[in-house]
Amino acid sequence: YLGEDYRAVVVASFPGSGRTSIGDILLVNGVPLQMTEAANDPTSPVHTSRITEIVKQQSRYPVGYIGLEQVVESSGKLLEELLKQAEEHRIIVVDARTARDIDAIAACCAASGLKIAAIDPGSFTAALAGNLFKRKKEAIQKKLLCGIGSASDLTRQQLQYLKKNANPLVVRI
């Protein structure tokens, strides 16, 4: 629990792995999420591609939304909309199609002065951290906790890649 003063910003996109969101719809390699193998996931099947609906099903807090047209318009408009949404919503879903969109969202979140909890597959968190901490990259050993809530083939492939390249401690629950 982070406290009432935090806002969760959900950026479900990860363009580098084929995940983008347009019009509150999560696309995986151009296919709506509910039409992918995620629909048949044995542990948590997905029945909608609408990100706000998925979040609403998992939270008791009001969910706001910022569309792609606001993300690409200008940083001033995006910041204005972020602050407006934060007044009424604890959770804000934001569309992104490209890494540049994600960088723009992260820059606005950092500039907003809001306490932000990043909810995403990773690229938004990295961009937000880069904006918040603006420091040189250093080779620092850090611990990282990852939670995997899916049993899809893609998730298994990603976990195999992680095992091969990072030597993680994997705990199955």
Short names for language-model regions:
Residues 62-69, 91, 115-121, 168-173:
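Flexible, glycine/charged-enriched surface loops at secondary-structure junctions
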Residues 108-115, 166:
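Soluble secreted/lumenal catalytic domains
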